Amino acid sequence: MVCIPCIVIPVLLWVYKRFLEPVLYPIISPIISRFWRKTPLQDTPQQKTSTAECNGAANGSTANGPKTVADKKAD
């Protein structure tokens, strides 16, 4: 058995999106846009690049190095 809110909430959301939003959005949108303006993006300063060399190893391991096999649980 499905709980009542699991049925009612999607139906109410569908009614809102289908019927109420087309009527309410043109009224509410100008009011919201006055308070919630988009601010222009600001340029961030360039970060200093690191002078350390990269040898291609991640955490000290290499792709061509020795491979260890994980222990499998014996039944």
UniProtKB/Swiss-Prot annotation:
Which keywords, in A-to-Z order, does the entry hold? Endoplasmic reticulum, Lipid droplet
Region forming the signal peptide: none
* Gene Ontology cellular component terms for the protein in this record: endoplasmic reticulum; lipid droplet
Q: Does the keyword Endoplasmic reticulum apply?
A: yes
Give compartment(s). Endoplasmic reticulum; Lipid droplet
List the residue ranges of the region (Necessary for its localzation to the endoplasmic reticulum and lipid droplets): 1-37
Q: Does the keyword Oxidoreductase apply?
A: no
* Pfam families linked to this entry: DUF4512
Q: In terms of domain of life, where is this protein from?
A: Eukaryota
List, alphabetically, the InterPro entries matched.
Answer: UPF0729_C18orf32-like (IPR026776)
The ranges of region (Disordered) come to: 43-75
Primary localisation category: endoplasmic reticulum
Q: Where is the composition biased (Polar residues)?
A: 43-65
Its family? Belongs to the UPF0729 family.
Name under which the protein is recorded: UPF0729 protein C18orf32 homolog
Organism name: Danio rerio
